[in-house]
Amino acid sequence: MSTLTRLLFLLAIFAGAIASAQWKKTPLQAPAQPNPQLYREDANAGADINRALVAAARQHKRVLLDFGGNWCIDCHVLDNAFHQPRIAPLLNDNFVLVHVNVGQYDKNLDIAKRYKANLEKGVPSLAVLSARGEVLYSTEDFERARVLSEEDVIAFLDKWKPPAPAASPAKK
């Protein structure tokens, strides 16, 4: 067998292994009993966000805004993922989560606009804020949460969690 043939053979095996690993990702699941008040009708989103910013500053976290509605299956799928054993600690240790109710796209649209949440593709839509309220990232990548995996959510949270505090110099 020529060197080129061996190389192509090894590349084919490697590509197959990667494809197999990708195929095994398990899609997120809807909860058995969706929370009918996940996005509270009576919530004051502006006040909730302000409280989250104060808590985030005090706890050295970021704020994760989750724009959605109680009618939205993908919103419940994503929230269910947030409670899974591999995801919950990552979320809770690094973010203050605020659910922002957009109703039937008729509530809190000013807040969605302020935080650059693009609702045109659907919900859930997420925005990551610094503890000072700066929009670090805004995405509509979760509007089809049912096709995402736990690994996708973990990768997103890992990417946007706050940086580890700088190590203080050793005292002499």
Q: How should each PLM-predicted stretch be described?
A:
Residues 1-8:
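Bacterial N-terminal signal peptides that target proteins for export
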Residues 106-123:
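Structural alpha/beta surface segment adjacent to cysteine/selenocysteine redox centers
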Residues 80, 87-109:
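Thiol-based oxidoreductase modules, predominantly thioredoxin-like and allied folds used
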Residues 59-72:
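Short active-site neighborhood of thiol/selenol oxidoreductases, capturing the structured segment around
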Residues 69-82:
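Conserved redox-active cysteine motifs that mediate thiol-disulfide chemistry
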Residues 23-59:
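N-terminal leader/targeting and pre-domain segments
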